[in-house]
Amino acid sequence: AKTIAYDEEARRGLERGLNSLADAVKVT
């Protein structure tokens, strides 16, 4: 269960990073 929770957190972090990256590209 710990691995699954960590995986979900990592996935969320990745999505957040991609979103911020896309936002930065849009702004630029």
Curated annotation (Swiss-Prot):
Give the main EC class.
isomerase
| Catalyzed reactions | ATP + H2O + a folded polypeptide = ADP + phosphate + an unfolded polypeptide
Principal localization reads cytoplasm
Q: Where can this protein be found?
A: Cytoplasm
**Keywords from the UniProt entry:** ATP-binding, Chaperone, Cytoplasm, Isomerase, Nucleotide-binding
What is one GO cellular-component annotation here?
Answer: cytoplasm
EC numbers on record: 5.6.1.7
- Source domain of life is Bacteria
Quote one Gene Ontology molecular function term. Answer: isomerase activity
Q: How does it assemble?
A: Forms a cylinder of 14 subunits composed of two heptameric rings stacked back-to-back. Interacts with the co-chaperonin GroES.
Q: What does this protein do?
A: Together with its co-chaperonin GroES, plays an essential role in assisting protein folding. The GroEL-GroES system forms a nano-cage that allows encapsulation of the non-native substrate proteins and provides a physical environment optimized to promote and accelerate protein folding.
The entry's family comment says:
Belongs to the chaperonin (HSP60) family.
Question: What is the name of the protein in this document?
Answer: Chaperonin GroEL
